[in-house]
Amino acid sequence: MELIDLKAEPRKGRGKSAARHLRNNDAVPAVLYGAKMDSMPISVSTLDLTTMVRVHGSSGLFINLAINGDTVPSRTVMLKEIQMDTFDLKYLHVDFQAINVSEKITISVPVEAVGESVGVKAGGMIQLIRRELDIICKPGDMPEVIQIDTTDLEVGDSVHVEEIDLGADVEIPHDVNFTVLTVVPPTSDVEEEEGDEDLEEDVEETAAEEEEGVEE
């Protein structure tokens, strides 16, 4: 399990004005919480956060968080959530969750389709229904990505949660029948089928109208 070093400062002010002041001074308001601790308002450097996300992404990160003035040198945490202003692309707030590496946690892991399926070779397309899945495991057992082999999938085939095996130490807490990905037919085929259905409906409606006219 890789731990990424990140520094933080205690945060005294609360409310929108205090948060705005932090953002205007190259810092992002954040909070650290955990099962056996009171939540701690903190802040992190905007530059440090940006660099971390650019290098490591924002999913499934475990961090060695050193808070200035804390009672311990550092805490093992995971990045739980980042809130962003999607218009200005600025960080608004960050949630960190303290963890115990010997205890199981729930975390989201990205899903990746691998291999060129029979269906894709025939013109179909892989459609990811769920780009991330929640898993329950110890931090050290967490896979960086859930890879699904699509080699033998034909058009119309799907992969469900019950078909994904991540080992005995990793649990997927989703419904076993949940569809994760599917191989869909080419768009042109779908449009042709829809067109044929519309044509059949038009013919049936015309025939019905003609029958009504004859009866009158």
Curated annotation (Swiss-Prot):
BP term (GO), one: translation
Keyword Oxidoreductase set for record: no
Signal peptide: none
InterPro entries tied to this protein: Rbsml_bL25/Gln-tRNA_synth_N, Ribosomal_bL25/Gln-tRNA_synth, Ribosomal_bL25_b-dom, Ribosomal_bL25_C, Ribosomal_bL25_long, Ribosomal_L25_dom, Ribosomal_uL5_bac-type
Pfam families: Ribosomal_L25p, Ribosomal_TL5_C
Region (Disordered): 184-216
GO cellular component, one term: cytosolic large ribosomal subunit
DNA-binding among keywords: no
Origin: domain of life: Bacteria
Acidic residues composition bias: residue spans: 189-216
Alphabetical UniProt keywords: Ribonucleoprotein, Ribosomal protein, RNA-binding, rRNA-binding
GO MF entries: 5S rRNA binding; structural constituent of ribosome
UniProt function note: This is one of the proteins that binds to the 5S RNA in the ribosome where it forms part of the central protuberance.
Subunit field text: Part of the 50S ribosomal subunit; part of the 5S rRNA/L5/L18/L25 subcomplex. Contacts the 5S rRNA. Binds to the 5S rRNA independently of L5 and L18.
Family to which the UniProt record says this protein belongs: Belongs to the bacterial ribosomal protein bL25 family. CTC subfamily.
PANTHER family: RIBOSOMAL PROTEIN L25/GLN-TRNA SYNTHETASE, ANTI-CODON-BINDING DOMAIN-CONTAINING PROTEIN, RIBOSOMAL PROTEIN L25_GLN-TRNA SYNTHETASE, ANTI-CODON-BINDING DOMAIN-CONTAINING PROTEIN
UniProt cross-references to NCBIfam families, sorted A to Z: bL25_bact_ctc
Name used for this protein in its record: Large ribosomal subunit protein bL25
